[in-house]
Curated annotation (Swiss-Prot):
Its main location: cytoplasm. The reaction proceeds by a bi uni uni bi ping pong mechanism. Coiled coil: none annotated. This is Pantothenate synthetase. The gene is panC.
Length: 282
């Protein structure tokens, strides 16, 4: 595996590779990330990964400097997965001058859910992903469903800019007890780690309530409120539990709900000092 930090060197290395499959990450890799590499291999060749901790997507209360950086361990993991090139630029490589141009997602998708609680986050994500796409010029890019809203935003960005890239969604990888794998899990205390699977069970409870009752009399806002209250009773601090349409992450109308519109339940909640997100499609 070749490790590259220069944008020009990356382009030179990939020249003529018109089937490249790309997996962007911020490093600190775990099994969930590695599953993305394996899926990428099924959809393209060669597999190209990136590791870049993107300052633009960190808010004022989010510590960019404390984000775990484990490059050597990450390199070993990617080598074992047969990744062809790792693009690991420095901040100077990616932003040699102030990044004055930004890619801002539409407000109806970028300012809800995660966007409401992390202002500017998706603007930072879209800007760096667009730049990474420009650097790697892949045919395929793989994004995990765990970051469901991010997946939707990147997919729409690719469509609206007519980028010749297929966005492939990857299923969330979970521990045996259901907790979604995340770099943030390392911050959980033993007691918090034992409690953490409750978040996924809450999503299942919401799904069972929605699917098990009479749709004509269902009150989705009340279902969401009860789920938030249940988490609060266990010591969580939920930002949201939201039942949304898969297609655009807007709340379904009663007519859409009764017609069987495909839905997804999304949640974000703090357990102690650690903020976890998860989702479940209905």
């Amino acid at each position: 595996m070749k490790v590259i930090s220069s944008i020009q060197e990356l382009r030179d290395q990939l020249r003529g590779q018109n089937r490249a499959a790309f997996v962007p990450t911020m490093g600190n890799l775990h099994e969930g990330h590695l599953s993305l590499m394996r899926l990428a291999r099924q959809h393209g060749d060669p597999v190209v990964a990136s590791i870049f901790v993107n300052r633009l997507q960190f808010g004022p209360n989010e510590d960019f400097d404390k984000y775990p950086r484990t490059l050597q361990e990450d390199i070993e993991k990617l080598q074992s997965e047969g990744v062809y090139v790792l693009f690991a630029p420095s901040e100077r490589d990616m932003y040699p001058e102030p990044q004055e141009y930004r890619v801002e997602p539409p407000h109806d998708l970028g300012d809800i859910l995660e966007g409401e609680f992390r202002p500017g986050f998706f603007k930072g994500v879209c800007t760096v992903v667009m730049k990474l796409f420009s650097c790697a010029q892949p045919r395929v890019a793989v994004f995990g469903k765990k970051d469901y809203q991010q997946l939707m935003i990147v997919r729409r960005m690719v469509q609206q800019f007519a980028l010749p890239i297929d966005i492939v969604p990857a299923e969330t990888v979970r521990a045996e007890d259901g907790l979604a794998l995340s770099s943030r899990n390392r911050y959980l205390s033993p007691d918090e780690r034992a409690e953490a699977p409750v978040l996924y069970r809450t999503l299942h409870d919401v799904r069972d309530t929605v699917l098990g009752g009479d749709r004509a009399s269902a009150d989705l806002l009340a279902v969401e409120a009860r789920a938030r209250a249940a988490l609060e009773q266990r010591g969580w601090k939920p930002d949201y539990v939201a039942i949304r349409k898969r297609v655009d992450l807007q709340a379904p109308t009663r007519e859409e709900f009764l017609a069987g519109e495909p839905l997804v339940i999304l949640t974000a909640a703090k357990l102690g000092a650690t903020r976890l997100i998860d989702n479940l499609e209905i």
